[in-house]
Amino acid sequence: LASVTQFEANSSLKISDSRMGIILGKSIEPETNEKSKTTNFTLKNFQPISFANAVVSMTAESLVVDAPETAPVITLKLENGSVQPFLYNKDILVTPIAWRLQNDNDKFKMHKFALACVLDEIEAGATDLVFYLRHDKGADDKTDVYYSNWYGYDIKNALERFKEKAGNLPTKLVIKSHESGNNSNTEIPENYTEYTVEYKIASTNQ
């Protein structure tokens, strides 16, 4: 708590204003064979996670309007694939996103990322809830630099709508993204890259 107070005093960022974030810190293990009941942890940095509701579109045609896509992303996995989309709890999906952009703060703000599903694709008895990661680059047409960040999405409404149509909750979430890989190609590829996350309510935080 003391390190949080000190961090906020030296920063314009207030941690309690963020719904989600990544905490970077430092802990020193005591040099003893006895297990300590408490561990001191010093907060070094806090990175807020952008958070939004997942988009629920009726049709593939309405998806184009509800969640525009004007550019691919590089990937949704980091650290040589060891970090990929995951469930934070039963209603929140978190994913890393890497993309290319112009090295300019105003252009950075133009990039928007939406997670969307299409109701028309859900059939009775379905077990896979498919999401599309949509990247809108705005007016940024350059690919000078590589950037990655974390994004969180509230999927509660999508889960409820899925249950209405399928008659059950999904057992698997499938995230599809158009990816350019490490090249600087801005054209949206024809095929998707897919990521899967098992949806097990009992194994996630409530």
Set out the residue ranges of the language-model regions.
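Surface-exposed beta-loop interaction hotspot
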Residues: 31-98
